[in-house]
């Protein structure tokens, strides 16, 4: 007999931190875990790659799902802000370079990811956005795609076009 608890091993993600409880089928995904001081907590390509890689790794096919059982993913942030949206520095760089293909690729990745989250990773996952800091632009869109939003008092949410 041992007192050692077996923990789920999760692949390390350079731009986010994941904590999982396999017994309760719950996952906590913290964006911006390695964000350097002064960096903007936004959807950099590396963060998006990590997020979609993790979410795809826990997405079950229909025949793998347990009827009547929901899984949960909480999306949070290790930064002062939840997420401030698009990577504006990348946008400026790609626009100056006339790199339409990379801009379209970035946009498609955002749209596909938000759709995957909105559909509950295929239907058996409830996505919860935990806003302990501002959610602006695409960060707010991510929160809106979740089935539940929990926000601390004083958190600002909004879109630049409003």
Show the residue positions of the predicted features:
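Conserved CoA-thioester-binding segment of acyl-CoA-metabolizing enzymes
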Residues: 1-73
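A structural preference for short, pocket-lining loop segments at secondary-structure junctions
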Residues: 29, 50-98, 112-128, 154-155
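Glycine-rich beta-to-alpha active-site loop
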Residues: 117-162
């Amino acid at each position: 007999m041992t007192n050692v608890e077996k923990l789920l091993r999760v692949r390390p993600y350079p731009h986010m931190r994941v904590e999982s409880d396999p017994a309760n089928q719950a996952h906590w995904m913290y964006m911006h875990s390695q964000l350097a001081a002064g960096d903007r907590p936004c959807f950099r390509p590396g963060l998006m790659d990590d997020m979609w890689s993790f979410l795809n790794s826990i997405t079950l096919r229909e025949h793998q799902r347990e009827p009547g059982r929901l899984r949960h993913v909480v999306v949070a942030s290790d930064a002062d802000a939840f997420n401030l949206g698009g990577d504006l520095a990348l946008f400026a760089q790609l626009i100056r370079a006339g790199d339409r293909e990379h801009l379209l690729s970035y946009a498609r990745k955002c749209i596909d990811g938000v759709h995957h989250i909105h559909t509950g990773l295929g239907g058996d996952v409830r996505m919860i956005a935990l806003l302990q800091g501002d959610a602006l632009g695409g960060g707010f869109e991510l929160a809106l795609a979740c089935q539940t939003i929990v926000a601390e008092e004083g958190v600002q949410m909004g879109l630049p076009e409003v």
